[in-house]
């Protein structure tokens, strides 16, 4: 497996960096945080991303997209982490597209994928029902009623739920035959359908998630996404895709936190010398650098595995998420330590990276969850 970027992938990484240097970053995030009317992301920034074609990258050409590689999109997510950009790109442009592409419901593919490519719709995917990620706990029910269905249940920590035009909800549905266990299904519902209530939550990194309550929401059979493999398999692959892209974001966070810390070590003086000359700090910095370099290879391996549809993708995804979560945690924690008390102030950027790292680590399972998942998938 080639773990080096090709020319196109390098170009998209550089272009994403150049764009986000000018249009995102801690100062922009601070302004977003202080705006009482904020949606948790910048509509202006999202509009510029649409103009650059980012939401269309993974969309097949037949639906107006560019059909680009996961590793190419992964370079953008890495830069998103570097510059703390907030947008619906992960959920709509990556996970929504990935799920619809794998579906055999041609109606929904033809209806939604072109809208995503054009930046004309936003989606949210409602999975978790507990405060910590546990996709095995699904109590939301899709129950047959009068020739249709009704959807009832509660979903927590729904990213982009506050701005979504539609939700893809993971729910339990009765088995096709009597006494068969319930199966899981993916249901598309409009955010304006009757019976849906949305409560928004502010995260420590200034982004937002939502709690969704579904009360007798009417659903037709057409709204249930169909697949050519089991829904459980589709869900696990979707979560693996999410965690690989979060690994790319966490790597970007770690890289920038390390860069900020090195800049501080080279400028802060104590006892008449730059603190970067202290051997103890040099050793800690060297360890961080080595870990980040390892993280780069891990993320490239995971993204390549997505493109090549590796049979071990679930295990690879969990290994990547577990490792990059620890790398980002160490990079931001060490960054705060090496900055000293001033690192905790709002004036310095390192605290923003610490907060983003904490949130991204927890989304779709923290490092402990993914160590367990990787071990289980390895036969332990």
Across the structure, where does each feature detected by a protein language model lie?
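Cytochrome P450 C-terminal beta-domain/meander region
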Residues: 134-152
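N-terminal glycine-rich flavin-associated loop
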Residues: 85-107
């Amino acid at each position: 497996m080639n773990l080096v970027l090709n020319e196109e992938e390098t170009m998209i990484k550089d272009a994403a960096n150049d764009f986000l240097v000018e249009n995102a970053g801690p100062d922009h995030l601070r302004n977003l945080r202080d705006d009482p009317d904020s949606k948790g992301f910048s509509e202006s920034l999202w509009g510029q991303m649409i103009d650059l074609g980012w939401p269309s990258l993974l969309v097949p050409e037949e639906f107006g997209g560019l059909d680009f590689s996961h590793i190419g999109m992964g370079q953008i997510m890495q830069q998103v982490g570097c510059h703390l950009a907030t947008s619906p790109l992960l959920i709509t442009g990556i996970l929504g597209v990935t799920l619809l592409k794998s579906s055999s419901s041609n109606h929904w593919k033809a209806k939604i994928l072109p809208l995503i490519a054009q930046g004309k719709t936003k989606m949210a995917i409602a999975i978790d029902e507990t405060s910590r990620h546990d996709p095995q706990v699904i109590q939301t029910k899709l129950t047959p009623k009068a020739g249709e269905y009704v959807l009832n249940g509660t979903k927590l920590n729904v990213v982009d739920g506050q701005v979504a035009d539609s939700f893809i909800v993971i729910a339990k549905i009765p088995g096709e035959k009597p006494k068969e266990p319930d199966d899981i299904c993916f249901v598309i519902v409009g955010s304006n359908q009757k019976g849906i209530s949305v409560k928004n939550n502010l995260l420590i990194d200034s982004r937002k998630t939502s709690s969704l309550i579904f009360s007798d929401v009417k659903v037709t059979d057409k709204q249930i996404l169909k697949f050519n493999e089991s829904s459980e398999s589709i869900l696990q692959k979707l979560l693996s895709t999410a965690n690989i892209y979060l690994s790319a974001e966490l790597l970007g966070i770690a890289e920038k936190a390390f860069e900020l810390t090195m800049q501080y070590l080279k400028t802060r003086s104590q006892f008449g010398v730059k603190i970067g000359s202290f051997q103890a700090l040099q050793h800690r910095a060297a360890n961080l650098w080595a870990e980040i370099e390892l993280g780069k290879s891990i993320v490239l391996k995971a993204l390549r595995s997505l493109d090549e549809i590796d049979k071990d993708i679930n295990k690879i995804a969990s290994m990547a998420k577990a490792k990059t979560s620890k790398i980002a945690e160490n990079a931001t924690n060490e960054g705060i330590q090496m900055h000293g008390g001033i690192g905790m102030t709002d004036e310095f950027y390192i605290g923003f990276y610490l907060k983003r790292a904490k949130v991204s680590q927890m989304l779709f399972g923290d490092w402990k969850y993914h160590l367990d998942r990787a071990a289980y998938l390895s036969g332990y």
